[in-house]
């Protein structure tokens, strides 16, 4: 479980760094295989980023994320980076990190746009639970995003996380 992993990180920093380096190398290998098989874009998910203090994440994990993103982008593939729950840590997202950053539903698009470098596009932010609402309400909510898109055309409409397993297919 994550609490035990986080404790391990604090108790065994060097071992954690070694483990993260090994996982990073595997991620780069995986991304390279995806590129070799013809992907048009790559999305890197860091679903647990928000469980760590921002300073710790920036110091210990963002450099490894950048190794992965550099490997992908050096092959001419655009990269979308998803950091769930990081909130104010979005200010560390620059064009050197990614082309687009996915925003979870816990951070407003307006706040994200103010924090993230203007050359980095935004994706997401729609609460996956919205898809349980009546279709009329879904349409109204999506309509409310038009104003943001008109001011910030480098936004990709998307959920702020994955589709939930029991989401009605019609929605």
Segments from the language model and where they lie:
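Active-site loop segments of alpha/beta catalytic cores
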Residues: 1-171
